[in-house]
Amino acid sequence: MISDDKGLRAAMHATRLAFLAAGFVMACWAPLIPFAKQHVGADEGVFGLLLLCLGLGAIVAMPLTGYLSARTGARAMILLGGFGLVAFLPLVVIAPTVWTLGLALAVFGAALGTIDVAMNIHAAEVETRAARPMMSGFHAMWSVGGILGAGGLTALLSAGLSPLGAALVGSALAGCAMILAAPRLLRQSGGAKPEFVRPRGIVLLLAILAAISFLVEGAVLDWGALLIVDQGLMAATGAGIGYMLFSIAMTIARLTGDWLVAALGRGRIMILGGLVAMAGIALTLVPGMLWPALLGFALIGLGCANLVPVLFSLAAQSRDMPPGLAVAAVTTTGYAGILLGPALIGFAADATSLAMAFGALALLMAAFPLAAQRASRIG
């Protein structure tokens, strides 16, 4: 029993390291984007297509990861994805042509999709063995990694280090985290019958909710600063503060999320999270007032923070599909939301206004309190 407890604690730490490393590497890419664009001489339109390669690589890899994890367990896929990110971060900086950058980004995205699905499958298994909520804490480490990665790479570049040098430092740090995690990950045997990961049963509802939550997160990332400028609340140079407050609030909420889930239950977290996010969206649309808008972005982060971790936990407990396949299905559908959502917001904003398009997100978030009872009734 003592050995089992030690093994479980080690697996918890390894899972946190995997989330930290993945969030760190992904955030390291953000400050390197302008340098990669300049290196290949791509204009905005071409570079937009190149960034789409990253997303498509992730989308393709996710269901395949669920399939393979069902056969062999998540450990091998976590290591494949994690070390793939470590290897390809420097390569996306030095890719000499548009075509090689597109290929490198597709592989980088595939590695991201692989570790994203696999570490959530592993996290669900650890949570099940621990018999207590842990998913929000794991996702908090992704958020912490994101803050460290973006801040660290920005500091290195500002200090005069070359883009390749900064990328190599980021890869080395993430690689160390993966090396520490590797021997402590659960050695699951898999054994579930592999099958196509089309969501079905309650997993379909969870997947739709994940797509909505990811869509809102993507909208805040891609359109939040533009909304602040469009509303005449702040100049473009400072408009990124909205997303910063969103990210900080989300990280804080996830660090306390496991305690909240244990105290309130997953259904109440979905209800409260949806309502808080709806209130936040409404505040961002108050005309001519900056502080309500900034408070609104923070509330969106607080509300959305624990929704996706709860959905992943519920997917892993569903009897409609094997846990690994269910998590893969929810993750893949969620990423479709974050990829397609911002584009849909753009189309809606063009047809109406950005404020109206943002307001429509509140209507979508109403799905969480409305569906909470059904979605959280697993069994």
Where are these regions (language model features)?
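Conserved MFS/SLC helix-loop-helix module at the cytosolic interface between two early adjacent transmembrane helices
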Residues: 60-95, 99
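Short amphipathic helix-loop junctions that connect adjacent transmembrane helices
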Residues: 31-45, 222-238
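Short hydrophobic/small-residue motifs within alpha-helical transmembrane segments
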Residues: 55-56, 143-148, 246-248, 252, ...
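Helix-breaking motifs and short loop linkers at transmembrane-helix boundaries and internal kinks
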Residues: 41, 73, 94-99, 233, ...
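Helix-to-loop junctions at the C-terminal end of transmembrane segments
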Residues: 61-73, 157, 253-265, 349
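Intracellular juxtamembrane helix-capping segments at the cytosolic ends
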Residues: 114-128, 306-319
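Structural signature of the two symmetry-related core transmembrane helices
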Residues: 76-90, 268-283
